[in-house]
């Protein structure tokens, strides 16, 4: 059975060899990995992946409570995921979560609750039946090699055992479902008690066990319980007394900012009709029997008006109820107080009203309208009035009646914790509960207990006046003196309080003036510092501007100097070029004249030679004279050569004048040195003319 191979009926593939099964077959534990879960195949049948069984056999039929759906059923086939929240109940085949191969049920919200039913435990579904979006059980060769020991024959044998186990576990699953529901209720209550604002990700949770019971509940599977993230835990629990108080304080502060402006003109308060079922119409009914019902109380008070809410404490035999209007409450009190019911005398009184507050330490400029508007920020007000004497003088106190007890409690708390001012004066209003006695009937005779011994002793003597100097007169006078002392001390205390108030008022005004003066000084110092800072900034900007201006001037001056030097150089270059051009033109002219002169000088030399030696000498002299005269010209270009000894007519010295003229004429040229023989005649063939090109006469 271990090495049996399932053959492919299509005949398209040959069976693959199987490895021997190991004794300790390890399940596929890919829990908590980021990659997709590999398919745990029991045996490869050689067919395509679509035709193979998706899930291997479940080798562990033990309870899957630890990994299954949040304590959902054990047994062979594990529980389905519970709805609601993000429970990831990843119950795999080998974890006892889902029977016969354990489909991976990932519950991500109530609309994706894919439960596995009992008929899915036969492992005959194709891979298309399972949700593919989870990336759950994919083909992997390595996982196939590791888990090839689980054959289909073994899975068939175990499937039959699982069906039997499911039938046995189904009854247990029902009991576990009830237990789990109770556990979830306790977990939710605990989560609400802990004000941890975590999102509720728990599943709905049902029973685990046979064929798709509930998982997920109470944070099962991979639902990591973080604070109140239990199964079906309810949202963000941001309630609580502190949060409620903070919310009330926030809205009170908002309403206070809206009226923080001047209160010179306030509209008059419309006198509204009496509020129905107000706190002033609440009656206390005592000495009742413990068998009385609300219907009997309504029938008892029905002739006197409409009855509102009723609060009964039958253990202590008393009841609180509200009548529609105050006049009807008075009628009911007078009629039913002292009446008998089942052998007991009823006691009917007005209940203490916790919505009425006494406001004292008010300035004389606080009116009914200002008092109403100031205390309206705490909640709706039924009545607000200033207490005055018979002449209409302000007594420095008033009464505020709220519509709700919560508003009165908030007002009392905030005014005691902080200083609440109504005007510009720094006298905070003092708020305290006020006990209002609306009982105008007093104490009738029927309300007294005449069975007491003290009653009989006190009533034994009637009204009388004491005689002077008698025992009764002496002690009666002492009682009067005691009350007079109390009254005098009370008056003295009031006068002292008045003086202290005036003193504190003067100190307050002086301190206010000093504070305003100090604030003005601080403002002045601040402005002076700002002015000094602005002055320093202005000076810095001026300095920077001056430095920039100097840099710009220096740059401009440097540019101008460079431009001037450039212009001078350009002018010098231009003048030199002009002189060179002029000299070049003159040199060309002299060259042309020289060519002409050389032509004439050659003819003269020929004639002299024909005349003999003397004539030759004369002719040579004449020739030399012409040439030398040409060379002595101030425009001669041959001055640029060294050794040019110019001689005048027949070898005579030209004299210093000619030499000076030649030097002045060629002063601009520094190409060579003018060596002129100025001393005596030089006669000969050359005629004293040492020209560089060595022209000789024969």
Curated annotation (Swiss-Prot):
Keywords: Coiled coil, Repeat, RNA-binding, Sensory transduction, Vision. One of its GO terms (biological process) is visual perception. InterPro entries: NOPS (IPR012975), Nucleotide-bd_a/b_plait_sf (IPR012677), RBD_domain_sf (IPR035979), RRM_dom (IPR000504). Residues 61-86, 201-220, 228-242, 599-623 have a biased composition (Gly residues). It comes from the Eukaryota. Residues 281-353, 355-441 form the RRM domain. Pfam families: NOPS, RRM_1. Residues 108-126, 145-197, 624-636, 643-660 have a biased composition (Low complexity). Residues 518-561 have a biased composition (Basic and acidic residues). Disulfide bonds: none annotated. SUPFAM superfamilies: RNA-binding domain, RBD (SSF54928). Residues 484-582 form a coiled coil. Required for normal vision and courtship behavior in Drosophila. This is Protein no-on-transient A. It comes from Drosophila littoralis (Fruit fly). The gene is nonA.
